């Protein structure tokens, strides 16, 4: 049986730190971020289905979100100000991401490749799936800003403002619901979020 480096590469997601140009109270890695994006994307899909007449496969969307930054094990996490410095850099980075996604897919064993390819290759996602994962990705970055600001780290003030604009551009009914129901708790301390439901 031929060996595959697929999961050895994926396990390195935990070694790639996000927000590398900014001082962090708590460092966040790509593995942690991917789990949170998967949970939030699943919630957004479930909210859309339950409250707003959606027909999404919430479990598939959670899987897509789990793998949405997987190619960064080959490219690293390029800081947002660099990635979107101008349209040419953004376009070139998208091309690099596509190459990295394909390289990662090619590492999977032949008999499993058709399972992992549609999870890693964003071109295999529907527009609606892409939109939900992008919403969740932006929401999680926004939540990171709230956590850092709550811890007294003003370094994330401008990032929060930028992400508020991004969230407004990606706005949806399910995102509005999530923002109204779940986000306010991120401004509270552990004691405050625990007092209503003590063990």
From Swiss-Prot:
The HD domain, residue ranges: 30-142
Cofactor or coenzyme needed: a divalent metal cation
EC annotation from Swiss-Prot or TrEMBL: 3.1.3.89
Alphabetical list of SUPFAM superfamilies matching this protein: HD-domain/PDEase-like
Residues with site note (Appears to be important in orienting the phosphate for catalysis): 18
Location, primary (coarse class): cytoplasm
Cellular component GO terms, alphabetical: cytoplasm
Pfam families to which the protein is assigned, alphabetical: YfbR-like
Keyword Transcription in record: no
InterPro entries in alphabetical order: HD/PDEase_dom, HD_domain, YfbR, YfbR/HDDC2
Broad EC category: hydrolase
Any one GO molecular function term: nucleotide binding
Signal peptide (UniProt feature, chain positions): none
SMART domains: HDc
Keywords: Cytoplasm, Hydrolase, Metal-binding, Nucleotide-binding
Binding site for a divalent metal cation: 33, 68-69, 137
Function according to Swiss-Prot or TrEMBL: Catalyzes the strictly specific dephosphorylation of 2'-deoxyribonucleoside 5'-monophosphates.
Family of this protein: Belongs to the 5DNU family.
NCBIfam families: PRK03826.1
Subunit text: Homodimer.
Name by which UniProt lists this protein: 5'-deoxynucleotidase YfbR
Species for this entry: Salmonella typhimurium (strain LT2 / SGSC1412 / ATCC 700720)
Phylogenetic lineage: Bacteria, Pseudomonadati, Pseudomonadota, Gammaproteobacteria, Enterobacterales
């Amino acid at each position: 049986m031929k060996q595959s480096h697929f999961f050895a590469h994926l396990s390195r997601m935990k070694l790639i730190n996000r927000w590398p140009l900014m001082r962090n109270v708590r460092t966040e890695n790509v593995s942690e971020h991917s789990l949170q994006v998967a949970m939030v994307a699943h919630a957004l899909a479930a909210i859309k289905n339950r409250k707003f007449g959606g027909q999404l496969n919430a479990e598939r969307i959670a899987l897509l979100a789990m793998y949405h930054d997987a190619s960064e094990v080959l490219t690293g996490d390029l800081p947002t100000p660099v990635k979107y410095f101008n349209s040419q850099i953004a376009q070139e980075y998208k091309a690099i991401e596509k190459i990295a996604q394909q390289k990662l897919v090619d590492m999977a064993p032949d008999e499993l490749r058709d399972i992992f390819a549609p999870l890693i290759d964003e071109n295999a996602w529907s527009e609606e799936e892409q939109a939900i994962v992008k919403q969740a990705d932006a929401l999680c970055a926004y939540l990171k800003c709230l956590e850092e600001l709550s811890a007294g780290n003003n370094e994330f003030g401008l990032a929060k403002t930028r992400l508020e604009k991004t969230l407004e551009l990606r706005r949806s009914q399910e995102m509005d619901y999530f923002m109204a129901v779940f986000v306010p708790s991120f401004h509270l301390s552990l004691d405050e979020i625990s007092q209503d439901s003590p063990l």
